[in-house]
Amino acid sequence: MLVVSELSKSYPTAGEPLSVLRGVNLELSPGQSAAIVGPSGSGKTTLLQILGTLDEPDSGSVQINGQDPFALDARERAAYRNQTIGFIFQDHHLLPQLSVTENVLIPALANGKPTSDDVSRAAELIDAVGLSHRATHLPRELSGGERERVAIARALLMQPSVVLADEPTGNLDSKTAKTITELLLRLQAEQNTVLVTVTHSLSLADEMNERFELVDGALVRRGRFGITA
């Protein structure tokens, strides 16, 4: 369960502070997905960073399964983040010198050497995203869609309660984007996680259970956008 209450964030400027988020509220149960759309500079990435505990709000709260991660010290919060939150970035953030399997196992390294269970789960996820035949390949040997599949598998390795995706199909052609969207939603549903996606793609947004637009720093619920391509 992800519960966001009255979240606000501003940044200092030469003049008045720049208010980016104003009283944001959001509640998602396990298995639910939400898209957040809005123009560049509207605060989408800031919101995602706060949900991922990579930035702190000025006021308001974030709770994941009843736990406030901002009540933890920096070390505890980092450990909590690694166990509870999965990230999918637009540019993948795959380490070029590591194989597909090694990249998927990166979250397990925070606990030391990956366990046999970690390795088994990585293999299962790599198979689930259709890359068993690429398990030993390096990122440079993969297509954009294949790299996105690796990122999805890595995000799910630790069985997180929440997955945060920043433009997961932003660099893909429409056909590949559709395939990746279907894969992501299938695995998210199977694992019963919360999925929050920041996107400019209205067709991707339409695939989510909930759709929100950031307007003047506040989240406004929207219906389907009706975009099919």
Swiss-Prot record:
InterPro entries: AAA+_ATPase, ABC_transporter-like_ATP-bd, ABC_transpr_LolD-like, MacB-like_ATP-bd, P-loop_NTPase. It comes from Rhodopirellula baltica (strain DSM 10527 / NCIMB 13988 / SH1). The keyword Membrane applies. Belongs to the ABC transporter superfamily. Lipoprotein translocase (TC 3.A.1.125) family. The complex is composed of two ATP-binding proteins (LolD) and two transmembrane proteins (LolC and LolE). Its EC number is 7.6.2.-. It comes from the Bacteria. The keyword Translocase applies. This is Lipoprotein-releasing system ATP-binding protein LolD 1. ATP binds at G38, P39, S40, G41, S42, G43, K44, T45. Part of the ABC transporter complex LolCDE involved in the translocation of mature outer membrane-directed lipoproteins, from the inner membrane to the periplasmic chaperone, LolA. Responsible for the formation of the LolA-lipoprotein complex in an ATP-dependent manner. Keywords: ATP-binding, Cell inner membrane, Cell membrane, Membrane, Nucleotide-binding, Translocase, Transport. One of its GO terms (molecular function) is ATP binding. It is a peripheral membrane protein. It is found in: Cell inner membrane. One of its GO terms (cellular component) is plasma membrane. One of its GO terms (biological process) is transmembrane transport. It holds the Pfam family ABC_tran. Residues 2-229 form the ABC transporter domain.
